[in-house]
Amino acid sequence: TRDEVARAILKEQLNGKKVYIDLRHLGIEKIKQKLPSLHNAALMQSGVDISEELLEIKPVAHYTMGGINTDINTKTNIENLFACGECADVSVHGANRLGGNSLLEGAVFGELAGKKAKEYAFNREFLPIDYSVVIKNMDLVQRIFDGDCTKNFNAMRISVGKIMFDKAGIFRNEVSLQEAFDYMKYLRLESNTLHCIDKGKHNNVELISILELRNALELSEAIILSAMKRCESRGAHYREDFPFTLKEGNAHVLIKELQKGFFKVHYEE
């Protein structure tokens, strides 16, 4: 499966070796027919013609086993909120989604979420708007606009991905996870000093990027804490210090942010 292949590839690369995929036996006609996007991407990005050359490969993040906790009808614990697709965890894939199965979440549960939300809306009054939440988020946006930016946003964004891959990615252990968590806490504080250079209020891509980075840091902390809680290996979650799978580990790790930077983590059958 993908997680086993990813570990095997990375293990070779950590030992200084390169790993390649060989598609030359397929021939140019079959490659253009069956793998046109891969053929074009390899040519454009790496200058490699996969019908004649080996293509160097490496593992990357593909899918997150987890998401917003929902029931089988896509309902969340927040009234009037339904979730589907890759933002949600309806628990159909377990610890490792296999290739070709992504349509289940998007098509099947996407349709179900729409139907259930419609049924629910017809039988409910709209909840009153909590303007305190609106004002809180408006204040956050205004703080991002105010002030001069002295931090390198791109460097911070790149470091998030690198640390998460190196310390909390394919191979994990208690030490690496703690190091990743400490660094994310540091970056989360640093992200408060990010401000927009572009002060325009209309379609401000810089503002969106800063908000996305703040969300990514919050999510990274949640992923790390969940990985620290699960003292076993299961699917794509591989702990070098706990390489075995526990029978009693067949349960969800649920995480909830009680307030900024403070999480509650627990198992739920």
Regions found by a protein language model. Give the residues of each.
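Glycine- and aromatic-enriched mobile tails/lids
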Residues: 8-14, 63, 69-83, 87-269
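FAD/FMN-dependent oxidoreductases across multiple families
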Residues: 36, 41-82
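An anion/pyrophosphate-binding glycine-rich loop and adjacent beta-alpha core
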Residues: 1-53, 116-122, 162
